[in-house]
From Swiss-Prot:
PANTHER family: 102 KBASES UNSTABLE REGION: FROM 1 TO 119443 (PTHR42978:SF2), QUORUM-QUENCHING LACTONASE YTNP-RELATED-RELATED (PTHR42978). Gene3D superfamilies: Ribonuclease Z/Hydroxyacylglutathione hydrolase-like. Keywords: Hydrolase, Metal-binding, Plasmid, Zinc. Zn(2+) 2 binds at residues 107-108, 202, 247. Its EC number is 3.1.1.81. It comes from Agrobacterium fabrum (strain C58 / ATCC 33970). Pfam families: Lactamase_B. This is N-acyl homoserine lactonase AttM. InterPro entries: AHLLactAttM (IPR054889), MBL_superfamily_lactonases (IPR051013), Metallo-B-lactamas (IPR001279), RibonucZ/Hydroxyglut_hydro (IPR036866). Belongs to the metallo-beta-lactamase superfamily.
Length: 263
């Protein structure tokens, strides 16, 4: 039987400016942020959360992403794609049961369509928005990453089915956290022998967002962004959860990375 574990992995980095991550801060200073993704192993089948950058940007960033590379430049080695990293841990991509998407921005879609037996779980509002984003958000969605034939999708419906229990045993719970993107969701991971871990993903890029010291440099709704952080703070306190923010280079350094794991 497979143990229930959480692996924290990284799909390269993004080079940008401080103000791209922390609104109106940094005076134009350069900033480099990690691109995390996660693997949950489970006897019922494994889950990949997000998958990071698409492997195509390792060889042709501008060809795959286009003009957004002028703002966010991906740094990714050819062996840092999510499939290769999961294989390197000794897991078969065919055993991945779920690919769960926090949202569909370009640095979170690296797993879509790359695991042959996976059901892809996403908020319906996010999926629909990704095909017809507003002008200011269009560069963040790379349609060829998620508009692929033959994919099996499972759609969640915001507050209607909030706190969805993916496995039915409490291991992985979704939390609807719109704001950064219209259909963003965060996750609570419960493990047999560790404190719960709250994966904010991009609901809180950094601890500055979490502590309400800064707004993120990109968001779809300021009000929703702020209220989603408040929701997560309450939820984290209720569950005594360790908070894992989305792209904080300082905080991310403090967590165990694969091949180490949380169990």
């Amino acid at each position: 039987m497979t143990d229930i574990r959480l692996y924290m992995l990284q799909s390269g980095t993004l080079k940008c400016k401080v103000h791209n991550i922390k609104m109106n801060q940094g005076n134009g200073a350069d900033y480099e942020i990690p691109v995390p993704f996660f693997l949950i192993t489970h006897p019922a089948g494994h889950t990949v959360i997000d998958g990071g950058n698409a492997i195509e940007v390792a060889t042709d960033p501008r060809g795959h992403w286009g003009g957004i590379c002028d703002v966010y430049w991906p740094v990714l080695d050819k062996d840092q794609g999510c499939v290769d990293q999961i294989k390197a841990l000794g897991f078969d991509p065919a055993d991945v049961k779920y690919v769960v998407q926090s949202h569909l921005h370009l640095d979170h879609t690296g797993a879509i369509g790359r695991f042959p037996n996976a059901t892809h779980i996403v908020q319906r509002s996010e999926y629909e928005y990704a095909f017809t984003p507003d002008w200011f958000a269009g560069g963040g969605y790379i349609r060829k990453d998620f508009d692929k034939p033959g994919l099996k999708w499972q759609f969640l419906n915001g507050a209607q089915d909030d706190y969805y229990d993916v496995y039915g045993d409490g291991t992985l719970t979704t939390i609807f956290t719109p704001g950064h993107a219209p259909g963003h969701q965060s996750f609570l991971v419960r493990l047999p022998n560790s404190k719960p871990l709250l994966l904010t993903i991009d609901a809180a890029y950094t601890l500055d967002h979490w502590e309400e010291k800064a707004l993120p440099g990109f968001l779809a709704s300021t009000v929703d962004t702020v209220r989603s952080v408040q929701k997560l703070r309450t939820y984290a306190e209720k569950h005594d959860a360790t908070v894992v923010t989305g792209h904080d280079p300082d905080a991310w350094a403090n967590f165990k990375k694969a091949p180490e794991f949380y169990a």
